[in-house]
C-alpha cells in the first residue's frame, strides 16, 4: 500500500509518496520483512508561473507544473531540471572512474505520481498566462468573450441556403420517425 502525504503552501503543494516495507519469503520458508522503504518527493505547481516555485526548486524534489480544471488534471513539461541533470552527470562520472571499461550510464528522471486518476498530458498548453485569466487554481476562462466559438441556433441572420442547427436536428428527427405498422403473424394463414 502506498501512502501519499500532501502539504500546501499558497499555490504550491508538496507531495511525497512512501511505499511500506515488503514481506519476502526466503528459501527455507521463513517470512522476513525487508527494511527497504521507497520515498518519492515532488512538488505540484497549480499554475504556469515558474518563478513562484523557486523555493521548492532549491530543495531536492522534482517539480511538476500541473493545470487543474474541475476533476481533470494536465501535466506540463518540467522547465527547470538543471539540478537533476547535473546530479545525474556527477553520479555517472563517479561510476565511470570506478569502471573505466564500461560506458557511463545516464540516469532517467522519474516523476512522482499525480494525485488524480484522470491524468492527461497536454503538450500544447501555452506557457504564458497572457491569453487566460487565472481564478485560483481550479478555474480558467478567456479574457475576451469574443474568443469563444459561437454557433447560431436560429436562422434569422443566416441565408436560407444553410439551415440552422435546430433545423438540422429537426430534419434528422423527421427523417428517422416513420410508421412501420404492426402485424401479428400468429393469426395469418400460411
Curated annotation (Swiss-Prot):
Q: Disrupted gene: resulting phenotype?
A: Morpholino knockdown of the protein causes inhibition of primary neurogenesis.
Q: Which residues cross the membrane?
A: none
Q: Does the keyword Membrane apply?
A: yes
Q: What's a GO biological-process term for it?
A: neuron differentiation
Which key words tag this protein in UniProt?
Answer: Cell membrane, Membrane, Neurogenesis, Nucleus
Comp. bias intervals (Polar residues)? 117-133
Cellular component, GO, one term: nucleus
The ranges of region (Disordered) come to 88-156
Here the segments flagged for biased composition (Basic and acidic residues) are 136-149
InterPro entries membership:
Vexin
Q: Where in the cell is it found?
A: Cell membrane; Nucleus
The organs and tissues expressing this protein are described as: Expressed in differentiating progenitors in the developing central nervous system (CNS).
Does the entry annotate any disulfide bonds, and if so which pairs?
none
Similarity section: Belongs to the vexin family.
**What is the purpose of this protein?**
Required for neurogenesis in the neural plate and retina. Cooperates with cell cycle inhibitor cdknx/p27(xic1) to enhance neurogenesis and increase the levels of the neuronal determination factor neurog2/X-ngngr-1.
Q: What is this protein called?
A: Vexin
Q: Which organism is it from?
A: Xenopus laevis
Amino acid at each position: 500500500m502506498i501512502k501519499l502525504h500532501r502539504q500546501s503552501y499558497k499555490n504550491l503543494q508538496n507531495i511525497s509518496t512512501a511505499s511500506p516495507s515488503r514481506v519476502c519469503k526466503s528459501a527455507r520458508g521463513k517470512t522476513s520483512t525487508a527494511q527497504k522503504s521507497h520515498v518519492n518527493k515532488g512538488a505540484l505547481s497549480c499554475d504556469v508561473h515558474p518563478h513562484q516555485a523557486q523555493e521548492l526548486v532549491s530543495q531536492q524534489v522534482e517539480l511538476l507544473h500541473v493545470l487543474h480544471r474541475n476533476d481533470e488534471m494536465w501535466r506540463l513539461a518540467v522547465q527547470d531540471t538543471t539540478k537533476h541533470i547535473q546530479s545525474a552527470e556527477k553520479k555517472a562520472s563517479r561510476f565511470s572512474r570506478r569502471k573505466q571499461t564500461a560506458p557511463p550510464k545516464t540516469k532517467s528522471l522519474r516523476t512522482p505520481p499525480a494525485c488524480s486518476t484522470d491524468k492527461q498530458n497536454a503538450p500544447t498548453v501555452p506557457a504564458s498566462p497572457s491569453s487566460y485569466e487565472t481564478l485560483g487554481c481550479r478555474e480558467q476562462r478567456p479574457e475576451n468573450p469574443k474568443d469563444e466559438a459561437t454557433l447560431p441556433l436560429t436562422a434569422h441572420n443566416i441565408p436560407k441556403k444553410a439551415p440552422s442547427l435546430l433545423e438540422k436536428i429537426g430534419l434528422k428527427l423527421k427523417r428517422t420517425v416513420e410508421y412501420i405498422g404492426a402485424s401479428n403473424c400468429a393469426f395469418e394463414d400460411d
